[in-house]
Amino acid sequence: MTSKHQQKGSIVNRFLNSVEKIGNKLPDPSVLFFLMCVGLAIMTWVISLFNVSVKHPGTHQTIYIKNIISHDGFTMIMNDTIKNFSEFPALGLVLAVMIGIGVAEKTGYFDKLMISVVNRAPRFLILPTIILIGILGSTAGDAATIILPPLAAMLFIKIGYHPIAGLTMAYASAVGGFAANIVVGMQDALVYSFTEPATRIVSDSIKTNVAMNWYFIAASVVVLLPTILLVTTKLIIPRLGKYDDSLMHDDHEETSSHITDKEAHALKWANISFIVTIILLIITAIPEHSFLRNAKTGSLLDDAPLINGVGLIILVVFLIPGLVYGILSKEIQSTKDLGKMFGEAVGSMGTFIVIVFFAAQLLAFLKWSNLGIIAAVKGAKLLEHQNGIVLILGIIILSALVNLLIGSASAKWGILAPIFVPMLIIVGFHPAFTQVIYRVGDSITNPITPMMPYLPLLLTYAQKYDKRMKLGALLSSLMPYSIALSIVWTAFVIIWFLLGIPVGPGGPIFVK
């Protein structure tokens, strides 16, 4: 998938080619997750022989390794396997969203929209716009992670770039930019919910608030956008080379780049319907007692139907313009056409569903056995006697490594906050800055962590454009983003620390 010239190129390219070669020797992702489950079970059996334990930093309860290869372990497997699969966090969301996105895709709405964007937008703004949307998309949860990569892939083809470059750039922007945004959003509320009680472990006088990282996360957008753009234009696009459309999956359809009068008419009204839908959503959310707000607090972010129902919102937001375009362009002439599109959209997720079955078991094994918690606590304790820049680097590295074991941001910070926050308060750091350090460390390995539930989805997307695509090749195009984010963002945190600038309103670096 790399050009011959690039294969013989720089040290960086040779390194990435080696990563790709090694990664491609890995089994199919579903088999890989199964083997990881087996390996994890064996590991818990071995560790349990040594009676390894830790004290939970929040409850102070002693936590032991639970052996999966035991009576209780086998009982858990029998009782919970199907539940683990059906309750997998991303499964229902992805399948529901794909109903709406599938109609918009199958009718040709997305394709014609991309052609229209390419024809009208200045070429130099297309890539920065995709990156910015990806970074800011975390405000609406995981929406950008699902929607943006396939849109970017189609757009990259239209402007003459390799679609995999678009997929990986959009994905890296969406998941790697979780700790960057110009507004306070769901991620801020999520981490704050753990930081506040962790602060109270050692102090009742330190004030915290949900927006206490705002200055830093807003400034991070300015730092991340050019970083991701540079990696894409200087490394990923040249490395992937010219796209060979013969590699495209047989059932992937490409339409003409020409827009007919009928299609232009349908596209105009589809776009209008999209805008009207968004406006109606905003108007509905404005009233103080809107059903989209938290009934008790009135918040639109904290446990609000607006955020909890984001999957349904995405479905509707894309289904409506897809239907309008399909009806006006005559792509949908009966309910049978619509039903067929629904089925094809969900059917295209078959590979993802199989991978999810095994990935769900791996996550459940880590949680049930307590291995994830013990690894996090043991690692955090290594940092207790450090300070300053060394401590910042240590927490970023540990958070990044824990992210490779535990995918859920709330699960990780729920474990680490009761350790990091009190520990750094004692050293002299305000909880707001501790939270920033964690969020950066958590974000930088998001593009490459196998625990991210959307990585299998990205692989499914990629295989539509390259039938030979394997996980190793995909990771080799994602790794440069993680490396670049690690270097640039860590340096940015350290510079911010040395300057002593507050990370947000009510969020100083040091405890006064």
Regions found by a protein language model. Name each.
Residues 1-25, 54-69, 237-266, 509-512:
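Intrinsically disordered, low-complexity non-transmembrane regions of multi-pass membrane transporters
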Residues 14, 53-87, 201-209, 286-306, ...:
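Interfacial loop/helix-cap signal at membrane boundaries in integral membrane proteins
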Residues 20, 149, 153-244, 260, ...:
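Membrane-core helix-loop-helix motifs of multi-pass transport proteins
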Residues 26-34, 38, 63-111, 303-371:
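Core transmembrane alpha-helical segments of multi-pass membrane transporters/permeases
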Residues 32-48, 94-102, 133-135, 173-177, ...:
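Hydrophobic core segments of alpha-helical transmembrane domains in multi-pass membrane transport
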Residues 46-72, 187-190, 289-298, 369-374, ...:
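Interfacial/capping segments of alpha-helical transmembrane domains
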Residues 72-73, 85-91, 118-129, 163-165, ...:
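Membrane-interfacial loop-to-helix junctions in multi-pass transporters
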Residues 94-95, 122-153, 158, 353-362, ...:
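Hydrophobic alpha-helical transmembrane segments of multi-pass integral membrane proteins
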